[in-house]
Amino acid sequence: MRSVARLRRAYFDCRYGQLHVHQALPPGGGFDEATALLCIPGTHGTGTMFHALLGPVGADRSIYAPDLPGCGQSDAAGQPVGVEQYALALLDLLDSLRQRRVDVLAHGAGADTAIALAKLRPDSLVRRVVLSSPPPGSREAARQLGIECRELPLAGPAEERFTAASVGAQFDDLIEFLGSGKQA
C-alpha cells in the first residue's frame, strides 16, 4: 500500500507579499525523496485545483501548489501582474524552500509561467513539465529550452479537471513520469 503525504498550508514571503501555498510532504520527512513538484495554476488561479493530487503524488515527493499573487489567500501584488511576475514570485518561493530543481505540473497559462520560470533560472531548475490545457506554442517553447514535456489531456470545467476521478485513468502514467527522477 502506498504511503500518504501529510497535507499542510503555509505562507511564504515573495516580492509581492505572501504566497499562500498548499503543500504535501512525504511521510518520511522528505529525506531521499523524488524531485519536488511545483503545481502552477493558470492565470488568476489557486493551488486548490490540485488538491486531489497532493496526497497520492506527495507520498514520495514534496508538492507545492501556490495561490498566485492576488489570487486565493495570497497577498495582492499592489501592481498589475502577469506571467513574468508570477514566475518571479514562484522563484522567490523556490528560493525560500531551497529547491534547486523541481518538476512542474502546469495548467493552462501556468505553462507560460513555467517557461518564464525556466528562462529565469536556466540552470535546470525545471526538469520536466506536465501540461494540462496549455496555450498554443507552450509545449514547443518548453522543448526549445530542453525541458522534457508530457501532456495530461484533461477536459471539462476547471473545477473538475484535477478531481481524483478525472485523473484516474492517467494517474499511473503521471506517477511514472514524475516518479522517475530522484534528486541529484
Identify what each model region corresponds to.
Residues 1-37, 58-61, 124-127, 131, ...:
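Alpha/beta-hydrolase fold catalytic core
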Residues 20, 82-84, 112, 126:
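A structural signal for the main folded, soluble domain(s) of proteins
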Residues 23-73:
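Conserved HGGG/HGGXW glycine-rich cap/lid loop of the alpha/beta-hydrolase fold
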Residues 45, 56, 96, 116, ...:
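Active-site catalytic microenvironments for nucleophilic, acid-base chemistry
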Residues 51, 91, 115-119, 172:
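Short, hydrophobic alpha-helix immediately C-terminal to the catalytic nucleophile
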Residues 53-57, 80-83, 122, 146:
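Glycine-rich, phosphate-binding/catalytic loops in enzymes
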Residues 64-105, 109:
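Active-site loop/oxyanion-hole signature of alpha/beta-hydrolase fold enzymes
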Residues 100-139:
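Conserved hydrolase catalytic core segment
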